[in-house]
């Protein structure tokens, strides 16, 4: 919720329209187009709620800004990660589509984000991210009862070229497609 006012400053005539629990919503315009900024909380369930409720209000394009933990050594602190897909190692997306359905972003939005990063001169990476439910589990797996499985999967994600670990993209992509 704390990022919303900072992002809303980039809008013309921003105004806060709602604040309830983890959902802080601002609306304004950007280059003449209506734009809203909404926090989604942490994880898939709260992201799915935000996407469903905003879609019911007529929102048709979603861009999530957040943090992630690097898996690839190529990703440095402060780099921009643009997800081309998400490993669905979480539960929310399974409520919307079979696990075989890929969690991928809309191609037009993906290419717009890549072009924006290029034009702004950002250091950015495109690729698959791992989406999970546990904030700490993959980052200190040795203390978890399933440490062997977590370590095995972490190594698999690294070998497969997964860029980063986060908690919302699979829900965003899958709910957005449903």
Give residue ranges: language-model regions:
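Short secondary-structure transition/capping segments
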Residues: 74-77, 137-139, 177
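Metabolite-binding pocket within alpha/beta catalytic cores that recognizes anionic/polar moieties
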Residues: 1-112
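A C-terminal functional module that forms or caps the active site or interfaces directly
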Residues: 153-178
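Short, conserved beta-strand edge motifs with alternating hydrophobic and charged residues
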Residues: 64, 83, 125-132, 166
């Amino acid at each position: 919720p704390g990022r919303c006012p900072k992002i809303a400053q980039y809008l013309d005539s921003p105004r806060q329209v709602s604040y309830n629990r983890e959902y802080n919503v601002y609306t304004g315009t950007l280059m003449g187009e209506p734009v809203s900024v909404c926090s989604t909380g942490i994880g898939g369930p709260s992201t799915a709620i935000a996407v469903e409720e905003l879609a019911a209000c007529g929102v048709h394009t979603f861009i999530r800004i957040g943090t992630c933990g690097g898996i690839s050594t190529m990703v440095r602190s402060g780099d921009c990660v643009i997800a081309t897909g998400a490993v669905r190692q979480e539960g929310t997306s399974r409520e919307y589509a079979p696990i075989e359905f890929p969690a991928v972003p809309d191609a037009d939005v993906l290419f717009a984000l890549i072009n924006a990063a290029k034009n702004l001169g950002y250091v950015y990476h495109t690729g698959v991210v791992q989406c999970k439910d546990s904030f700490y589990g993959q980052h200190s797996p040795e203390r978890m009862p399933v440490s062997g499985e977590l370590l095995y999967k972490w190594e698999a994600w690294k070998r497969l070229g997964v860029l980063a670990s986060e908690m919302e993209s699979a829900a965003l992509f899958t709910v957005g497609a449903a």
